[in-house]
Amino acid sequence: MSAVLAEHAAAARRGTVPATAIVLLGTGVVGGALLKLLNTGAARSLRLVGAANSRRQQTDPVSLAQRNLREQLNQHGAPRDNASLLAALDASEAAVKVIVDATASAPLAARHAEWLARGYHVVTANKALAGGELSGWRALQAALAGGGRYGDAATVGAGLPVLSTLRRLRTCGDSLLTLEGVFSGSLSWLFNQYDGSRPFSDLLREARQLGYTEPDPRSDLSGEDVARKLLIIARNAGFSLGSDEVQVEGLVPEALRALDLDTFLARCDELDATLAGRHAEAAARGSVLRFLARLNQRGHARVGLAEVPLTHPAARLYGTDNQFALTTTRYNTQPLVIQGPGAGPEVTAQALLGDVLALG
C-alpha cells in the first residue's frame, strides 16, 4: 500500500472531508504516471475517490491505495459506470471535486461540458473537445461561464507554459498575431535526427522502439494531433477556427493509410524516396526540414513539412523538444519563444497534477 494514498484511505474511513477529491479516468501511461505523483507529498491535500480504465473502475478507498491499482482494476474492479464514479465524488463532500481525464477518448471528452455544467471541475490531457469541432469548443466555453474550471495545460506541449502564457498576455490586452512552431515530440525527434545519412524509415522504426511515437506511427505522421494542438492554441487566442480550416499535409501517402499496422511497418520504407528528395532540395538551399504548425493574423492555419534556414529557431531544436514562437502586438520585433520537452508521461502527469492543485 502506498503511504500517501494509505493516509487518504484512513481519512476516508474516519469520515474526514478532503479539500479536493479526484476521480481519475484513464490509468494508462499518463494516468499511471499521475498515480505515482499522487503518492508524493505534493498531493497530500488531495484524495483519490475513484479510478477507472476503459472497462473497469474502483471506488473502494483501500483498493485505491494499493500500489498495483492498475492491475487491481483489471482483476477486481467493478464494471465501468460513470454514474457511480460521480457519486463517489459527491459522497466525498469535498469543497473541490475534480474529474481528471487522462485518456484520448472522444466520447469522454464530449462529456466535459456536461460535467462542468453540473459543478465539477475538469482537468485533462484529452485534446478531443477543445481541439475538435468548433461546436464542442463553444459548448465548453458556455459551460465554463457557469463557474467551473478547466485545467488544460497537459493538452499542449505536455504542460509547457503555452496556454497559461497566452492567457496572461490576453488579460494584459496583448493579442496574438502569428504562431509558429514544432508541436510534436515524435516529429521533432525524427526531423532533428534526419540528415539524409539514414533512411527515414529506419529512424521511424527506432523512434517507435524508443516509445517516442504512438504504437501506430501513422497517428504521429498524419499531423492530425499537431492540428488539434494548433486549434486549441488558436481558439484560446480568440480565433474561431473550425477543424476543417486547418490545412494538414501529412506524411503518410494514401497507399499506406488503410494498411494494417504490421504491413505498414513492413512497407514504411516507401516513405524514404520522397523525403530523401525533399531533404536534398532543402540542403541545397542551406535549409533543413521541420514539421511545423503555423497560424497567421488572418486565421490561416497550416500543419506540415517545411524548409527552414539554419538560423531559424526550429532548426536548433534537440531531441523531442517542442517549440512555440508567439508574435504578438507587444512581442513584435522578436517572437516570444517557449521551448522544452513536449512529450513524456511524467511531465504530462505533472501538468495534470499542477492544474488539480491550482483548483484548491
What is the predicted function of each stretch?
Residues 2-24, 28, 34-37, 44-50, ...:
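NAD(P)-dependent dehydrogenase/reductase Rossmann-like domain
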Residues 118-122, 185:
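Glycine-enriched alpha-helix->loop->beta-strand junction motifs that scaffold or abut catalytic
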